[in-house]
Amino acid sequence: MIPIVVNPHPNKEFYVGDKTDKPTPSGSGVNVLYFTNKCNLACTYCYEDLPGRPPQIMTKEEISKFIDDIFARENPNNQTLIVLFGGEATLEWENVCYAMEYAYSKKLNVHFNLTTNGIKYLSQNFIDETVNNFFYKKRMLSIDISFDGIGNGDRVFHGGKDSTSAMIQVLTNLVKNNVRYRIRYTIQKNNIDNWYQDSIHIIKTFKPLRFITSVAWDTLDPAEDFSKLESAKELFRKDWFAGDLKVPVCELFCDVCNGCGERKELKTYFTNEGNVTTYGNYENTPKFHDFKEKIQ
């Protein structure tokens, strides 16, 4: 049983990402490219609220322009981070590869982060294509797989089928092929009661390089659930300091973990409509509205 630690406002201080002396270059950003608003899953808590909306897919011309805009804002002497996102970015893999190639042709000091639900990695051919990618081989491409463990029942296919067995196969495939990857885990109502134990099990079983957490705050009960976040956080930190946990749980250890070289000042988002959202990296995330309401 996890001991109860009371914190009335965990959403304001749950993470410690801003409690570090790492440099924060002016104008630097977590630069997110939404290649498409379409996805091969239909997660029940998805913030994008896309059913019935027409496709929004970036063209190569738009991709080039947005990357030029990002480079114009950022210091040319610092590394630029570009997040390859959706929807499901792997559904637009040709454009994803184009974005990496175009960005690299303009600036060598760049890193790409592919954020994906992982379903495409059921295919050995797609695994082979990824590990043979120039940027993956140069360690310029990191891969984040979304998986919610015991709460994964909310991550369903469009027909309503639970994706958990498919995701276990995906993670097994990645481990078998020695793919470098990280897991993104959303803490929500269906895993909050056991998210510490669940996370430790996932880390030990599937061996990600990092375990990156986010919180679906709207699904939690402040009176009952917020203390569970804080209690588990303290257990993770205890394990980290004791040396029992070697995989960083982001962003719970940023004050003591040297895994990242710098912090980013901004989060900036691009869809096919342009730079739709920009806000401070450690501000509370505003309600998602980047794909505007449309009539087909």
Model features per residue range: what roles?
Residues 86-87:
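Active-site neighborhood of divalent metal-dependent phosphoester/pyrophosphate hydrolases
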Residues 23-62:
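Canonical Radical SAM [4Fe-4S] cluster-binding loop centered on the CxxxCxxC motif
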Residues 2-4, 244-296:
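Accessory C-terminal segments flanking Radical SAM cores
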Residues 1-32, 76-77:
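N-terminal [4Fe-4S]-dependent radical SAM core
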